[in-house]
Swiss-Prot record:
The lineage of its organism: Bacteria, Pseudomonadati, Pseudomonadota, Gammaproteobacteria, Enterobacterales. GO terms for cellular component: cytosol. InterPro entries: Asp/Orn_carbamoyltranf_P-bd, Asp/Orn_carbamoylTrfase, Asp/Orn_carbamoylTrfase_sf, Asp_carbamoyltransf, Asp_carbamoyltransf_Asp/Orn-bd. Belongs to the aspartate/ornithine carbamoyltransferase superfamily. ATCase family. HAMAP family: Asp_carb_tr. It comes from Yersinia pseudotuberculosis serotype O:1b (strain IP 31758). SUPFAM superfamilies: Aspartate/ornithine carbamoyltransferase. The gene is pyrB. Gene3D superfamilies: Aspartate/ornithine carbamoyltransferase (3.40.50.1370). It catalyses: carbamoyl phosphate + L-aspartate = N-carbamoyl-L-aspartate + phosphate + H(+). This is Aspartate carbamoyltransferase catalytic subunit. PANTHER family: ASPARTATE CARBAMOYLTRANSFERASE, ORNITHINE CARBAMOYLTRANSFERASE, MITOCHONDRIAL. Coiled coil: none annotated.
Amino acid sequence: MANPLYHKHIISINDLSRDELELVLRTAASLKKTPQPELLKHKVIASCFFEASTRTRLSFETSIHRLGASVVGFSDSSNTSLGKKGETLADTMSVISTYVDAIVMRHPQEGASRLAAQFSGNVPIVNAGDGANQHPTQTLLDLFTIQETQGRLDNINIAMVGDLKYGRTVHSLTQALAKFNGNRFFFIAPDALAMPAYILQMLEEKEIEYSLHESLEEVVPELDILYMTRVQKERLDPSEYANVKAQFILRSSDLTGARDNLKVLHPLPRIDEITTDVDKTPYAYYFQQAGNGIFARQALLALVLNAELAL
């Protein structure tokens, strides 16, 4: 069966329909159950990270190797022609696209991946994060984890806590879950880091229920998923960071009265916002969530680079 993601740029989670999201998740589940070590044999994929990353970069590169493909690229753009000689991003992508079958790209500038897609010819760009904008593959692994732990993606009560202004993961995840039915959102953040107005407007236009809170305690008993985020020091001025960094911290005592099926997720890295005593509770699932990134990213790359895929 022809697959609709073949050679498709994956820039925003909004580039994927509900059917396409479900296709990726089915493929991820299949790859988790039955590895396919030669699925992308003879393919070459560029890993271009213009911004620091540990989990996302290593997860992508591991995914590439486990599918039998080769990976080339860089994790520090300061040593590239773009960083040292002033080459434009457009020229950099125009050249790299002549070497490889796909490009995985992270960049600090919002919209950089979509710009790159204009200059990569028929070589698909996979956005691994562009500034505070989008992080679609994190969203895919989040969806995969929610489905794995809850058995569904409809009728989920989810709280998102912390930095909802600059946290691209919560923007993408809210947009993705809005494609499913009956989901309810609880947004818990200080005013300075509130969910952007365009996300709230999208929910209102779709008549999706959401509420704003200043306390985690009042919503925990209603939740299926508690999605914690860190305050992003690199995107705040020092005075603002100092004011908000410790405002929302999850401790195991905060989970008293939680539903049995509750899972605590976090895109990582964790700084102060989840204390280590939470790790020992049955609710903690953030390390397994990170591990699911391998299968979600394998699935996406396999679909983007195979005209027909039946697993």
